[in-house]
């Protein structure tokens, strides 16, 4: 039986991060990958979706040309085939780039293509071969959730795994599940001329928790395509397409885009052989600060553990896992990053830090700043719609979280997340310089509202003096 120091299961973001670190120390490893290469982000997630969104944004802009004195927009048309070809070209560029610097450089003794299964806590079997590893990192990723009853729809059922392969877009599509992926794809398809209807089981979009931000998101996004919230949808194939039924009525579409979340790729890898208790979803016990499974020399990182299934977290978990795998049995508990999420819709949606539903409202200041008619730059852009919801701890006076729906929220969400990560007080944020006229002034106004609730007028007015010191 072959023996190696490290076994990495999965060649996604976490697995490749671990691979890079291990290769700097030793060649005594094997990477085993049973699915497609190139990472979820590059192949079916972040990157191709942004390519699609940018095409949609450019075409949608024609609707506002007249307001800016530009005539002739009515004559513009969209070539769906060319759009999807462009999306795939970028997708292929990114996936090729990922592989060129990682798996393409591995020899056949270091990279095995196949699905591995644990047969003992330190042994996996792949393609009929058993391999023993001193330390094992599980990074097998995730896949779209598809209800069994829907699978009979065949090619009328589309997930993020298939949408970017479409040569032509359907005329009518139901987007079921309006989290980040569903909302991004739904709005993009709508702007490209597809008739879109959105359905979501919860009463919010993108998992927003702030009541004000949630209402604003629903109001603004539903102007582009109809949205039905708080309703379970049933699907039924018809001769012409698919029938969608909710309590509000029945709708006929040509296809369904299922965006019901992602399921960790745990099944089939033999985790029961680890000798630890698995939960009702088949997940082994693991520490989010070490990525260690129980007390074993086994680590689980990235989408497969279901903790924070997003690229930057997968990379971070890959680093934690490999550092502790290399140091085993001496474990280091790493501080996790401040939660951060962004939806690339229009207006963009961002959320960070502590969620509204987790707040102790008696110990927290909550403010809501409406962008409408309150920011000069947004007004001249014709985009003064949105809200900034921020939360600050009364005792420490630190910013602890928030949600935004506004133009270019991706940038301001980062800015505010960094402030939470640095444990900055609200007054320190208000002391920062703000140029004019910029959208950042909206953030300044929102922070100012927090300051008014946390500090005396004298403390706020003393800012200039404090800055000079």
Residue ranges and their predicted role:
Residues 209, 213-216, 301-357, 436-459, ...:
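A conserved FAD-binding loop/helix module that cradles the flavin
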Residues 2, 7-35, 40, 47, ...:
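Flexible, glycine-rich terminal cap/loop adjacent to redox cofactors
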Residues 167-209, 310:
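Rossmann-like NAD(P)H-binding beta-loop-alpha module
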């Amino acid at each position: 039986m072959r023996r190696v120091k490290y076994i990495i299961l999965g060649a996604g973001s976490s697995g490749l991060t671990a691979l890079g670190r291990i290769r700097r120390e030793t060649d005594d490893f094997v990477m085993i990958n049973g699915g497609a290469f190139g990472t979820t982000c590059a192949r079916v997630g972040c990157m191709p979706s942004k390519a699609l969104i940018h095409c949609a944004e450019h075409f949608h802009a024609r609707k506002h040309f007249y307001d800016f004195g530009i005539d002739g927009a009515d004559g513009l048309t969209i070539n769906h085939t060319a759009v999807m070809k462009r999306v795939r070209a970028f997708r292929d560029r990114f996936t090729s780039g990922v592989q060129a610097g990682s798996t393409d450089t591995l020899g056949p003794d270091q990279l095995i293509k196949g699905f591995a299964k644990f047969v003992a806590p330190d042994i996996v079997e792949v393609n009929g071969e058993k391999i023993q590893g001193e330390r094992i990192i599980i990074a097998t990723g995730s896949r779209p959730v598809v209800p069994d009853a829907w699978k009979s729809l065949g090619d009328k059922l589309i997930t993020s795994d298939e949408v970017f392969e479409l040569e032509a877009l359907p005329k009518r599509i139901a987007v079921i599940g309006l989290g980040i992926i569903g909302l991004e794809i739904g709005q993009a398809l709508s702007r490209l001329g597809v008739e879109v209807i959105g359905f979501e089981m919860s009463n919010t979009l993108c998992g927003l928790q702030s009541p004000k931000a949630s209402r604003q998101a629903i109001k603004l996004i539903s102007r582009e395509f109809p949205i039905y919230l708080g309703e379970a949808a049933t699907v039924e194939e018809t001769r012409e397409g698919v029938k969608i039924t909710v309590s509000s009525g029945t709708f006929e579409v040509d296809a369904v885009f299922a965006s019901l979340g992602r399921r960790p790729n745990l099944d089939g890898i033999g985790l029961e052989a680890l000798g630890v208790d698995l939960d009702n979803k088949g997940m082994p016990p693991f520490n989010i600060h070490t990525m260690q499974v129980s007390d074993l020399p086994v680590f689980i990182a990235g989408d497969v553990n279901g903790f924070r299934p997003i690229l930057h977290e997968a990379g971070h978990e890959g680093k934690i896992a490999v550092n502790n795998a290399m140091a085993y049995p001496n474990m280091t508990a790493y501080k996790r990053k401040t939660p951060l999420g962004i939806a690339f819709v229009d207006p963009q949606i961002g959320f960070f830090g502590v969620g509204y539903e987790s707040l102790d409202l008696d110990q927290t200041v909550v403010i809501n700043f409406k962008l409408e008619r309150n920011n000069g730059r947004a007004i001249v852009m014709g985009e003064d719609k949105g809200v900034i919801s921020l939360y600050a701890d009364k005792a420490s006076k630190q910013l602890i979280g928030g949600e935004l729906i506004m133009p270019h929220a991706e940038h301001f969400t980062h800015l505010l997340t960094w402030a939470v990560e640095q444990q900055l007080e609200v007054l320190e944020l208000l002391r920062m310089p703000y140029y004019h006229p910029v959208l950042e002034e909206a953030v300044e106004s929102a922070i100012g509202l927090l300051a008014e609730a946390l500090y005396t007028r004298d403390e706020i007015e003393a800012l200039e003096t404090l800055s000079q010191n």
